[in-house]
Amino acid sequence: MANLPPRKVTSASKSKQDVSPLQILLQMGFRRQRALKALAATGNRSVQLASDWLLTHVSDSNIDADDPREYIFYASPTGPLLSQLLEFWDKSKSTCGWNGAHNFLPHITLVSFFKAPDDTSLNLAKAVRQVVENVGDPPKCTLKLEPYVSHNFMGLFISEEHAEYLKKIAVQYVKQVSSVSSINLEAHVKSLHITLAYHFEESSYEDLKTLVEEMQPVEHSSWELRLYSRDPRFANHQVYKVTQGYSPQASDELELVLGDYIYIEEKEFDISPDGWVHGTSWLTGLNGYLPAVYTRRTAETDAWTLLKAVSLGNNCSDCKSESGSNTDSEMAGTYPHEDAADLAYKKSEETYQEWDKYWSEVMNSRSDSILTITQGLPMNWELSKAAEEMKNNITNGTSKSRRWVFALRHGERVDLTYGPWVPHCFENDTYVRKDLNLPLKLAHRAGGKGGYVKDTPLTRLGWFQAQLVGEGMRMAGVSIKHVYASPALRCVETAQGFLDGLRADPSVKIKVEPGLFEFKNWHMPKGIDFMTPIELCKAGLNVDMTYKPYVEMDASAETMDEFFKRGEVAMQAAVNDTEKDGGNVIFIGHAITLDQMVGALHRLRDDMEDVQPYEIGRNLLKVPYCALGAMRGKPWDVVSPPCPPSINSSSGRFDWRILIK
């Protein structure tokens, strides 16, 4: 085949890949001011999100108003410290009622609210990354938080060394933004702290003080720099989340859509004679009267837009003092993991036998690729039908395309990787990690270690598998708006890993749906024991605490028909209820979930003649960890997923003693 000669002259000024989201929106017919407003309001995430925002705000009387958004720059804790702070939030709220701190996620303010034109939002987000690169990594010593308690304020103040680092970040961000624009902003450099409580009743002081004193902030914490924006019109409003849908019966009433946020002035509750209040929808920008009982107050930050999040270097592992060379006792095997020689022994031996078969196949057939052995015919994902259709929808300016609905099996699970693992990994009911692929830590649950026997977590590789799928979807340009997960811990963790890889906005939460759990009778011998939504949230999983499941599940036996019907009810209801809101849907469950999705959505067709009866087929054994199935509607058809699959080889446990000669 002849080599392709390089072109020396071209009339094209830029390729399609160089076309910006703004240019695509303009090509779709949207006015420049509206397009910029939509991109700023959705964090410049995608053309699809921006066009969806424009379509939902088509009747918003404020859509053409020249009212720039407000931005704020935070340092936000993540991981165990965030879980600890959220637990404090819950306790203080239930014990003492709402106070000012509950309006926001835990944070340290680096730059206070400032207004900026919509056409600067992308550069404001880029500046966050540039600031981290300019200032460098945070100090390597442990970050310490010092509690402070008074009658009108309670908080945690940052240790001096880390406070100086964050001040440099704040000052550098102000310089970075000011150097390229005339935006007026000011760094917050005095007494950096995390607010725990303020604007609380005097009668709550003692209870709040006790909660602060009981809390011992974890020292090994992770942090992110986050840039948020909000609609300035509602700066002094309270935010309420819709918990029950409502269709207007009068022209002055506001439609309530599950998951929407409503901006309501505090005075509305004082002047209302009948429990109806006036509010404005975050989703549509429309306003009207609504029954307050159909909403629940939530943090203002839930209705903000996250433009950029950049992780700061994890420093906790570098705080240990240096040690000398290995001692004889270390070489003899005194490490905690060395007493678990039998951990995964049987599984490892099975793996080594599979490896022997594989290498025999390679040598006999002279095959040089595992793809040849395990995959059959290769597929060109760049030219797949789904990828082409998706690409055309974007580049051709199609504002309305068929929705994606996905089904994803969970990632690699601990119990099927190691066999009986709990007896090896718990000492006096305390979890000890004895293999690098085991979880770093296990969250507290009511059932203790017995709960983990019945409800296994993911391995570290399982988390990574889930992140790979999310990353693949992100690189394919597909966003997810609605995430439903089986209540099994491995499925909820897979959902979180998927969202991490997708880099989804924190507002995209995991809805734990019992209807997606696999056949109950498979688990009857050892029982079913799920973690509660609160336990999952405390474990750092972004679970929707307000979600009301479509199916309530008990521990009684069920028939196979009842199992399939349970899944059908949940999947069909989720797809139908999210249709008006729009956005793609993913169900994260078990191996059978993929087949179950196909059957459930095919039953939404008008023509039911070709629909096959539910059954557990042989394909169940061909669904590996994090296998992804895809459908598009309407009509509902099985299509190629927008990203390729991933293949993993098994790995046995290594015994270092084989090196002793």
Swiss-Prot record:
InterPro entries: His_Pase_superF_clade-1 (IPR013078), His_PPase_superfam (IPR029033), Phosphatase_SH3-domain (IPR051710), SH3-like_dom_sf (IPR036028), SH3_domain (IPR001452), UBA (IPR015940), UBA-like_sf (IPR009060). The active site is at residues 409-410, 590. It is found in: Cytoplasm, Cytosol. GO terms for molecular function: ecdysteroid-phosphate phosphatase activity; protein homodimerization activity; protein tyrosine phosphatase activity. Residues 16-57 form the UBA domain. Competitively inhibited by 4-nitrophenyl phosphate (para-nitrophenylphosphate, pNPP). Also inhibited by tungstate, vanadate, and phosphate. One of its GO terms (cellular component) is cytosol. Homodimer. This is Ecdysteroid-phosphate phosphatase. It comes from Bombyx mori.
